[in-house]
Amino acid sequence: MRPKRESATSNGQTYFVTSNTSERRPFFRHERWANLFLSTLYGYRPERYLLHGFVLMPDHFHVLMTPQASLELAIQCLKGGFSFRAKRELGWKGEVWVAGFSDHRIRDGEDCRIHSAYIARNPVKARLVEQAAHYAYSSANGQFELDSFPLGLKPQIVLDSSGAAEAAPFQNNDKSSFQSNNESAFQGKNDDAQSLK
């Protein structure tokens, strides 16, 4: 049995949060779905959380955030707000997300560096792109406005010779057989969401 989550109130704590789509459906292979998620993520940012980093994968997301009130409320707004918009704007009728989410409280600058590098490397590890900077749906590409980390948590990201963020210790560093761009990465033969609007 999973222990009860400690309530994360407005205490200035930063979290690494992960949530999966329902049945691991690859909704975010579709540009309209991915852009709607990013719009929702940034729509709640001013009032619900500081956003320090993110990556949107075909069937899950990771975010580094400091909630303004509580972590639960921030994620409820993000996931619930996106579900509402997907039903209204994309005509989706089913579940979008699994219930709940996983979180990890960031302890210090090194912990922040590890999780920031994980965000950057996730699309590379999944062979969606060869370099983190080439992935359209990640803060690692430098195209998105982010909030500063709280004092003492600013990570020192080290880039390797290819310009990719240094991998966290628990990641696979295999760089073989990568796809070269998002377009080819998001084309799947077994696409559950193929009939989506």
Roles of regions detected by a PLM:
Residues 1-197:
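Short catalytic/metal-binding and nucleic-acid-binding patches
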